[in-house]
């Protein structure tokens, strides 16, 4: 039995609150159980220097946690004067994943920045950020379409992410903090709605995992992401948007 009482193949409660903030072109509060992340998508009419004059847009991301998002207060990285390696790794992952959802040329020479701010952490903050970030990105794109800044919808694929792992010898889906701490293997998977993999990050913590265990985890991830895609669609449908 998992600490939460869930089945091995069961997601936590998933919820999206769209248009959560006032000013951003797209925003959502995403909840994976007790993990809560505010994702905002901000559009700027410029691109990084390496893309100037090339007719292509860009998607990037920043990630952070409130000091008391965790069990004990964690000092702000800004106060230390630099970002930690974990933060940089996660925000690069978010950016890479969400770039796979768009035709960047159809976006035009503009940048969309996804800010993913964890207000409460209970495992899976990066997967929640990617899954919620997609919803915020679609909302921002709809704003661009309505204002006629772009002519065609650049979104060509739906993206979601989930964690899987092996806990006490059993492959499980969507690990919370308690499971993440004790997991023998921890893996983050990003997929699109075509069933293709965008990124797989996996590490053996307690002991090496076998090929059959890897296959079992990937099957769990595929099923979990299929459910997450439906949750995303329902949230966007509630805003009158067909993703």
Curated annotation (Swiss-Prot):
InterPro entries xrefs: ExoRNase_PH_dom1, ExoRNase_PH_dom2, ExoRNase_PH_dom2_sf, PNPase/RNase_PH_dom_sf, Ribosomal_Su5_D2-typ_SF, RNase_PH, RNase_PH_bac-type, RNase_PH_CS
PROSITE patterns, A to Z: RIBONUCLEASE_PH
Catalytic reaction equation(s): tRNA(n+1) + phosphate = tRNA(n) + a ribonucleoside 5'-diphosphate
GO molecular function, one term: 3'-5'-RNA exonuclease activity
Domain of life: Bacteria
Key words, A-Z: Nucleotidyltransferase, RNA-binding, rRNA processing, Transferase, tRNA processing, tRNA-binding
Enzyme class: transferase
GO biological process: rRNA catabolic process; rRNA processing; tRNA processing
UniProt binding sites for phosphate: 86, 124-126
SUPFAM superfamilies attached to this UniProt entry: Ribonuclease PH domain 2-like, Ribosomal protein S5 domain 2-like
Pfam families, A to Z: RNase_PH (PF01138), RNase_PH_C (PF03725)
EC number: 2.7.7.56
Family to which the UniProt record says this protein belongs: Belongs to the RNase PH family.
Known partners and oligomeric status: Homohexameric ring arranged as a trimer of dimers.
Function: Phosphorolytic 3'-5' exoribonuclease that plays an important role in tRNA 3'-end maturation. Removes nucleotide residues following the 3'-CCA terminus of tRNAs; can also add nucleotides to the ends of RNA molecules by using nucleoside diphosphates as substrates, but this may not be physiologically important. Probably plays a role in initiation of 16S rRNA degradation (leading to ribosome degradation) during starvation.
HAMAP family documented for this protein: RNase_PH (MF_00564)
Protein name stated in the entry: Ribonuclease PH
Native species: Methylococcus capsulatus (strain ATCC 33009 / NCIMB 11132 / Bath)
